[in-house]
Amino acid sequence: MASPALISETEAWKDLKAHLEGIKMTHLRELMGDTERCQSMMVEFDNIFLDYSRQQASPDTISKLYKLADEAHLKQKIDRMYNGDHINTTENRSVLHVALRAPRNSAICSDGKNVVPDVWSVLDKIKDFSDRVRNGSWIGATGKELKDVIAVGIGGSFLGPLFVHTALQTDPEASKNARGRELRFLANVDPIDVARNISGLNPETTLVVVVSKTFTTAETMLNARTLREWISSALGPSAVAKHMVAVSTNLPLVEKFGIDPNNAFAFWDWVGGRYSVCSAVGVLPLSLQYGFAVVEKFLQGAHSIDQHFSSAPFEKNIPVLLGLLSVWNVSFLGYPARAILPYSQALEKLAPHIQQVSMESNGKGVSVDGLPLPFESGEIDFGEPGTNGQHSFYQLIHQGRVIPCDFIGVVKSQQPVYLKGEVVNNHDELMSNFFAQPDALAYGKTPEELKKENVSEHLIPHKTFTGNRPSISILLPTLDAYRIGQVLAIYEHRVAVQGFVWGINSFDQWGVELGKSLATQVRKQLHGSRVKGEPVEEGFNFSTKTLLTRYLQATSDVPADPSTLLPNII
């Protein structure tokens, strides 16, 4: 008998639906009172401790989720990914970001070819180049050392590397290696982003890394041309070859741009943009800033989770457990959002990166076979570090909509602070909140408890907390390069698990394309109106035509053929 076309047609899905009502009637106060249950919902791998006991789930729920995973052929799908099968079916590609952090002697194949030697060829090239820049043997056009780097890219070429960079900035080893150096990321085509990136920098000491697989990404290439003009206007056109390098596979366009093809670093079609931080996209700028040795530890951390994900049984498998619980929260309990709440300022860019990884991967409305999904999938991801978020949006999480939360804590701070006479040190103050918030969400506060505290009758409705709000807690021993790699890989694989269970393609992003094609029409209109004075055509709807006309009229002082003008900011 053929497998059902949709996971929602399986017996395991229907069983979970039937199981749902009993769980909804059981409060987390009751579930948390079962010590045996709580112990069964704690998992440890490599000193990473996961506690999912504050999920609205019983041991029976978890067993039923394992059955759902079996009916979704989760293990087989994971194996197919690692084996290089073309699981990105709409683009007919392998999905092998795990190969980017595999040890040199590994064998991971795509289309019958072991891709690991190619990966390490690029990594060796990055190490050699970054070492030469850092030790001063590669210098700029005027003989000065290149101390500042601007990485130009957008989407996955920006968010992932920015997350890792921000996380490493205050790590003792990484910060020591980065002393006297600066790394910036230029992503938005908004000229304000250009101005902010070049502010305070000297073209003589700046190296630009242009990240575009095809070297045709509209926003990235306009920003790259802008920085090329910034460099050449100060140092002459010939300086571009010494001050700009590329991460791309389109060597003819790289050379045409003015960059020596020998200074181009490759990556491959089997690397999706949002999964590319472990390729030259992230490794090159991060190695220039922190040295290759630090970045290699980051890759090793990610690889440790890759091994764990591919080999650990589901009941001990952190990404699998997290992915299954997300499916439970989204598709059964009906919670559309998730808050990522790291109690470490170093992880402040984790949520924006995972927002892209998750929402671009699983923001789909059809199955891999093109069938409309009759259930909710995908999550709205957001977050801020604690305790900042507590003074921002936690109000809604406590007393408004139910939003499952990921609390991430670190045992040892990157930068400990102790003040004589204080009740606790700074990190303990932070962690006090990390431990308290999940319980506040789970237990809440009842009217009866408030009455015992002699709270005024008219305030009781306002001070009542319903509780029963799910969360997971992850406790990391430290936050160094290795652990940062582990955090990245846990979330990458969690997203894949969700997509595998839902039966969607988590590795394409056709939703990005429609807006791009419509922007081409607008770009053509803006050019025609600026240069030839053409009125806005009838091809636009009334609303867009009105907005475009208003914009053009208000910016009529923009010259049709302007002289080059670069941002003027000190």
Curated annotation (Swiss-Prot):
It catalyses: alpha-D-glucose 6-phosphate = beta-D-fructose 6-phosphate. Pathway: Carbohydrate degradation; glycolysis; D-glyceraldehyde 3-phosphate and glycerone phosphate from D-glucose: step 2/4. It is found in: Cytoplasm. The keyword Cytoplasm applies. InterPro entries: G6P_Isomerase, G6P_Isomerase_C, Phosphoglucose_isomerase_CS, SIS_dom_sf, SIS_PGI_1, SIS_PGI_2. CDD domains: SIS_PGI_1, SIS_PGI_2. The active site is at 360 (proton donor), 391, 516. The keyword Protein biosynthesis does not apply. Homodimer. This is Glucose-6-phosphate isomerase, cytosolic 1.
